[in-house]
Curated annotation (Swiss-Prot):
Disulfides per UniProt: none
Summary of the function given for this chain in its UniProt record: Involved in DNA double-strand break (DBS) repair via homologous recombination (HR). Recruited at DSB sites independently of BRCA2, RAD51 and RAD51 paralogs in a H2AX-dependent manner. May regulate osteoblast proliferation and differentiation. May play a role in the control of male meiosis dynamic.
Chief location: nucleus
EC number: 3.6.4.-
Protein name: Fidgetin-like protein 1
Quaternary structure and interacting proteins, as annotated: Hexamer. Interacts (via N-terminal one-half region) with RAD51; the interaction is direct. Interacts (via N-terminal one-half region) with SPIDR (via the C-terminal region); the interaction is direct. Interacts with FIRRM; may regulate homologous recombination.
Subcellular location(s) of the protein: Nucleus; Cytoplasm; Cytoplasm, Perinuclear region
Cross-referenced Gene3D superfamilies: 1.10.8.60, P-loop containing nucleotide triphosphate hydrolases
Length: 674
């Protein structure tokens, strides 16, 4: 009977939930019905009424339906679980006013019973450790006594030197927090004020009348911190301000007392307005103190950074930051001709700005920044920085073995360039190196690589420039850049100035040429070999071009060595193939390499590199598209000769026979080769 009754109960509940699900009611009851179904499934499976497989299927089915309602963003079919309850709670609440103040203050914290117990325990411990010598501060179990004198400004010196009776002052007590008394014990007794009647007007302010007044507590020494801080130790100060009136007028500041207390305490004690503001702060809540860290202008911050960077002594007094008039930027007013002082300097040292010595701005506004080298004194620092950072090449070193072929050109360059730079003591006089070298020939033969190898093997500073790096939209900037380039190169001797595509910079001058372009060429020729140049300068200009016939005659004269870089011969092409294939997996025999070299006649060095790159893609192209995503690098087959045969069908020589004939004729006329 129990089994049949329980089944009937389960059946009725199942039917009830099914009716709630299938009816057109809102989504809330539907979600509850699905959740009830899931609970029934778990209960039936726990009591072994259904199998695990059946429970898993049913649970998955109803869980998906339940999540479809819960996770849906649709207003009609989904269920918003949170918005309704949140809006209900927030709908009846009134918004807080902007003038709302928190009930949690320092006074309320000190009135708590737990804090009072801690303070009493601290008092007992401090009383046990109190020494008899500290007579100026007497700590009882319930009160703290301060030996404050009764100041009578108009009295004689004897009256001002006398101290009040200790028994009379013992009645005027005031409770202070534990940390206040601890620091007051360390600070002992302040010095007495003596003979103030000569300098002060008639004024008398006895301290005894304000014994019951509440003291405002701030630090005796150091800066005043904000009261509304999260730490209780930082909120509790030590400096005592009278809440009703000041003890000292503004004209009665004693130097000894001022040096003892610090400027912040004396200002607060001597200024009645500030004293009144402090008492108002105690009543109305925490307010920001006037002795917070002062604002620093961009110039002052830059000066501090320079002092820290160059480890120079701090020469600025306290008036450098607080005693002068604050203004954004420079200390003087900026007009039309004023100079903006950036907060962070661009130059980060003497070497990166072309030998310019970076000067701290605090050293003086009229003190100029003198360059380390006299040859750079008339140059703009921005141009020097551009040359040092953008034009100077910091690439990897290049060896002569990396250049295939051109044995005559390499031997000539070693003879006239590398050796004189390595041994300048031997190559003097007529043995001195030339001022310029011109490397001409078809494109892709290694002219740029030779220029880098010259700088790498000779240990020289390498400048790689182009026509675009020397031109500017401003009139006169191009020739200034050329002058700065050679000036920096003279400071960085030995130096190699490599000009790729030199025909675009030193083309033939004509009547229809622009004036700015003509001035740049003239300045370049003068700096290369002019009246101001020295024969002892170890500066080499290396120009590379594939259009030598367009170079100006004056530039051609200054480029003394004009070396023809022809297409690589068979041995050079073989060396290129072997060097490139040694880095890859290949199965080429010696005969196959010879066939590749023979078929690649009239190929330049760049064409040979492109041929090997195209052949290396052959094994990848032989794979199926589906295998590329799953195959490992070790499963890719090596490069075979058939890949080179397929590559020869797509790669052609980039130099025509007509261009080769032009180069050979120019070499016979102006070249220095065999």
């Amino acid at each position: 009977m129990q089994t049949s009754s329980s089944r009937s109960v389960h059946l009725s509940e199942w039917q009830k939930n099914y009716f709630a699900i299938t009816s057109g009611i809102c989504t809330g009851p539907k979600a509850d019905a699905y959740r009830a179904q899931i609970l029934r499934i778990q209960y039936a499976w726990a009591n072994s009424e259904i199998s695990q497989v059946c429970a898993t299927k049913l649970f998955k089915k109803y869980a998906e339906k339940y999540s479809a309602i819960i996770d849906s963003d649709n207003v009609e079919s989904g269920l918003n679980n949170y918005a309704e309850n949140i809006l209900t709670l927030a709908g009846s609440q009134q918004t807080d006013s902007d003038k709302w103040q928190s009930g949690l203050s320092i006074n309320n914290v000190f009135k708590m019973s737990s804090v009072q117990k801690m303070m009493q325990a601290g008092k007992k411990f401090k009383d046990s450790l109190l020494e008899p010598a500290l007579a100026s501060v007497v700590i009882h179990k319930e009160a703290t006594v301060f030996d404050l004198p009764k100041f009578s400004v108009c009295g004689s010196s004897q009256e001002s030197d006398s101290l009040p009776n200790s028994a009379h002052d013992r009645d005027r007590t005031q409770d202070f927090p534990e940390s206040n008394r601890l620091k007051l014990l360390q600070n002992a007794q302040p010095p007495m004020v003596t003979n103030t009647a000569r300098t002060c007007p008639t004024f008398s302010a006895p301290v005894g009348e304000s014994a019951t007044a509440k003291f405002h507590v701030t630090p005796l020494f150091g800066n005043v911190k904000k009261e509304n801080h999260s730490s209780a130790k930082e909120n509790i100060g030590l400096n005592v301000f009278l809440s009703n009136q000041s003890c000292f007028p503004a004209a009665c500041e004693n130097p000894q007392r001022k040096s003892f207390y610090g400027s912040g305490t004396i200002d607060a004690l001597s200024n009645p307005i500030l004293n009144k503001a402090c008492s108002k702060t105690e009543d109305n809540g925490p307010k920001e103190d006037s002795s917070l860290p002062t604002f620093k202008t961009a110039k002052e911050q830059l000066w501090v950074d320079q002092q820290k960077k160059y480890h120079q002594p701090q020469r600025a007094s306290g008036s450098s930051y607080g005693g002068v008039k604050k203004s954004l930027g420079a200390s003087r007013s900026r007009g039309i001709l004023g100079k903006f002082v950036p907060p962070i300097p661009k130059q980060d040292g003497g070497e990166q700005n072309g030998g310019m010595q970076c000067k701290p701005y605090g050293a003086g506004p009229t003190e100029p920044a003198h360059p380390v080298d006299e040859r750079l004194k008339n140059l703009e620092p921005k141009m020097i920085e551009l040359i040092m950072n953008e034009i100077m090449d910091h690439g990897p070193p290049v060896n002569w073995e990396d250049i295939a072929g051109v044995e005559f050109a390499k031997a000539t360059i070693k003879e006239i360039v590398v050796w004189p730079m390595l041994r300048p003591d031997i190559f003097t006089g007529l043995r001195g190196p030339p001022k310029g070298i011109l490397l001409f020939g078809p494109p892709g033969t290694g002219k740029t690589l030779i220029g880098k190898c010259i700088a790498s093997q000779s240990g020289a500073t390498f400048f790689s420039i182009s026509a675009s790096s020397l031109t500017s939209k401003w009139v006169g900037e191009g020739e200034k850049m050329v002058r700065a380039l050679f000036a920096v190169a003279r400071c960085q001797q030995p130096a190699v100035i490599f000009i790729d595509e030199i025909d675009s910079l030193l083309s033939q001058r004509g009547d229809g040429e622009h004036e700015s372009s003509r001035r740049i060429k003239t300045e370049f020729l003068v700096q290369l070999d002019g009246a101001t140049t020295s024969s002892e300068d170890r500066i080499l200009v290396v120009g590379a071009t594939n259009r030598p016939q367009e170079i100006d005659e004056a530039a051609r004269r200054r480029l003394v060595k004009r070396l023809y870089i022809p297409l690589p011969e068979a041995s050079a092409r073989k060396q290129i193939v072997i060097n490139l294939m040694s880095k890859e997996q290949c199965c080429l025999s010696e005969e196959e390499i010879e066939q590749i070299v023979q078929q690649s006649d009239a190929f330049s060095g760049a064409d040979m590199t492109q041929l090997c790159r195209e052949a290396s893609l052959g094994p990848i192209r032989s794979l199926q598209t589906a295998d590329i995503a799953t195959i490992t690098p070790d499963q890719v087959r090596p490069i075979a000769y058939i890949d080179f045969e397929n590559a020869f069908r797509t790669v052609r020589p980039s130099v025509s026979p007509k261009d080769l004939e032009l180069y050979e004729n120019w070499n016979k006329t102006f070249g220095c080769g065999k």
